[in-house]
Curated annotation (Swiss-Prot):
Keywords: Late protein, Virion. This is Minor capsid protein p49. It comes from African swine fever virus (isolate Tick/South Africa/Pretoriuskop Pr4/1996). Residues 134-167 are annotated as: Disordered. Residues 144-167 have a biased composition (Polar residues).
């Protein structure tokens, strides 16, 4: 009866949204404020009651926590389109990839860029070097200096007024795209896929991040040295690729660590161990862990540089309201503060299901996050924060190699299972077999 009553409230709400929240983001309208007004002490529904974590005007009133309300709304209507739980149908508004091609044949398609991410790149990653944006060289010095300031950046509503070239990136900042894959492979530039493809069937990962948006923003914001940038432009920035020169990879890791404030995994192994299947598996798993660290820092931590999200009130408000107590993935599944996160997360299958690594925020006295050793399966200590497997990511229609009964809070792997994962036969077990301390 309680379930039916609550469902009716949500159904009534969605049919006629109140005017006082018509200008709020969709995820706030449908999951935050409705439940705040219904269950946070406002018995008669006469006026909206705001939870202190919604970052909305009004007097905060003690009641259920925002995370409880979100989880409650998920239980009521898990098929709601505004909830990104990884189902292919939830990705439709954000991706032009056909459903049947989404995972098994993902490498043949280039992911769709969200309009918001396009504007982020155009507005905030303006480079003033002549070699990158030639038309900038004709500007006055004062204008050059102002290009990277939020006040002088073009409006999000008028991307045509942007100071960047008509093409997305110049040659110096052109990154790997899936259209380039056959051409690059023919030239012999990309060999990483040949090492990993046979060992990780079903894992949508060719040594490169499947979704470019986050990587482009990160790497352009790093202001990497010209030599590193040139090498990266031709390589697609594969962090774990053994064919990338060690000094370039370490430079990128160092820059990423400095920018995000999150410790990235240690240096490359000795030269004599940089070959063979053992190193390839190590490199791939290490790469995925690094990606997890970067994404966690950018989307769930408070180490984002101001100019990246300046003058975007909605994003600023939502990011400011995030409390760093839950791991990155939990927030990514529960909020829509960046559109492309819905298309990004499900494609990192190992990260999406193992949620690895998880920072221990209670021990950040020295300013560095402490990561648990996933090889010991200590992640199970955080069951309350790990989204349960819902069937969308490893659906048999999308990927027959992914275990259907997988749960992130499962018991530790047996010796046989660990051996199985070390052989690379099951993509879902790869990350947990590698320690972040390597």
């Amino acid at each position: 009866m309680y379930h039916d009553y609550a469902s009716k409230l949500l159904a009534d709400y969605r049919s006629d949204p109140p005017l006082w929240e018509s200008d709020l983001p969709r995820h706030n309208r449908y999951s935050d404020n409705i439940l705040n007004s219904r269950y946070c002490g406002n018995k008669n529904g006469a006026a909206p009651v705001y939870n202190e974590y919604t970052n909305s005007p009004g007097q905060a009133e003690k009641g259920l926590q925002l995370s409880d309300l979100r989880n409650f709304s998920f239980m009521l209507n898990p098929q709601h389109k505004n909830i990104g739980y990884g189902d292919a149908q939830d990705l439709e508004p954000y991706s032009s990839i056909p459903k049947n091609k989404l995972f098994n044949h993902f490498k043949n398609y280039r992911p769709a860029f969200s309009t918001h991410t396009e504007n982020l790149i155009k507005r905030n990653v303006v480079r003033t070097e002549k070699k990158t944006f030639p038309q900038v060289s004709g500007l006055k010095d004062t204008q050059k200096n102002c290009l990277t300031q939020p006040s002088s950046l073009p409006s999000l509503k008028n991307p045509k007024n942007s100071s960047v070239p008509s093409t997305r990136f110049s040659e110096h900042t052109k990154f790997f795209s899936y259209e380039d894959l056959p051409k690059l492979r023919t030239k012999g530039t990309i060999k990483h896929e040949q090492h990993l493809g046979d060992q990780m069937p079903g894992q949508c990962y060719n040594g490169y991040i499947p979704h470019q948006d986050v990587y482009n923003i990160l790497c352009l914001a790093h202001k990497l040295p010209a030599s590193v940038e040139k090498e990266i432009a031709g390589r697609g920035i594969p962090l774990g690729n053994p064919h990338v020169k060690p000094n370039i990879e370490q430079e990128l890791i160092k820059s990423t660590s400095t920018y995000t404030g999150v410790p990235i995994l240690g240096p490359l192994p000795p030269k004599d161990s940089q070959h063979g299947r053992e190193h390839q598996e190590f490199s791939a798993n290490r790469h995925m862990l690094q990606v997890s660290n970067i994404l966690h820092s950018v989307f769930a931590n408070h180490s984002i540089k101001p100019q990246i999200l300046e003058d975007i009130p909605v994003l600023n408000a939502q990011l400011a309201s995030i409390k760093p107590v839950s791991p990155f993935l939990n927030k990514a599944y529960q909020t829509h503060y960046m559109e492309n996160i819905v298309t990004l997360v499900p494609r990192f299958k190992s990260i999406a299901n193992y949620s690895s690594p998880i920072p221990n925020y209670s021990k950040r006295n020295n300013g560095q996050a402490e990561y648990f050793d996933t090889s010991k399966q200590t992640i199970s200590r955080h069951n309350n924060y790990i989204p349960k497997y819902t069937g969308g990511i490893g659906d048999s229609k999308l990927d027959s190699t992914f275990p259907k009964d997988f749960n992130a809070s499962s018991v530790p792997l047996t010796s046989a299972e660990k051996d199985h994962s070390l052989r690379g036969d099951n993509s879902a077990c790869c990350i947990s077999s590698i320690s972040p301390s390597l």
